[in-house]
Amino acid sequence: MAARDRHIDIKVPSPHLTPLLTAITHDEDYRLWKKSSKLFFRRGAQPLCHFVRKGSVLIARNEDAFSLGILSAPLALGFTVPLSEHLHLRTMAESEIATLPYEQVMAIVEEKQIWDLVAKHVMFVTNKIFIYNEMLTAPTSFDILRYQLLMLIQEPDEIRASTAAYQYILDRTRLSRSSIMKMLAELKKGHYIQLENGKLQAIHHLPTRF
């Protein structure tokens, strides 16, 4: 199945998250983080895992702040240590997050013998990363923009209401601002999408070619 047909899959949460959070975290582990808080996957030499039970976070690279996407609770992040240590989170809304040392998480997994649950979750997330990579390396600039619009329309209302469509796409792709603005203007002119003050309100129908 092509990425074009699977774009909606990227927003579907892992079916293994709820039992994973229940098994690993307790209420006292969670802290309330304000919007725009930044969390890293390493504290000194210690790798960390983040468990989000309320709110949404943006995942970005440390080196250039390139946005990899916005994810909403529930979330369990940090199991893939080599990859995670190059990333950070930024809360897009007030969020409840538990941050635990990776070694402590692995000790709990061993104690409760939930390796199968963790493996299934990691496989699910790995598949999402593969799909997202397909979206970012689509054949044409319009394909890339199209995928991002389909992602944006699925974001929570508060994110769509506070984020200009062009900025959302600019932060997550290597497309130029001018090409993004041109394609959005043409889509709006053709009544394919509805934009108000630059914010995406609706997608009526997206053509497969530009």
List PLM regions with ranges:
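Phosphate-/nucleic-acid-contacting segments
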Residues: L152-F210
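His/acidic/aromatic-lined binding-pocket segments of jelly-roll/cupin-type domains
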Residues: Y30-L32, F40-R42, Q46-V52, L68-G69, ...
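Glycine- and acidic-residue-biased ligand/ion/polar-headgroup-sensing regions
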Residues: A45-D64, A73-P74
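Cyclic-nucleotide recognition modules
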Residues: D64-H121
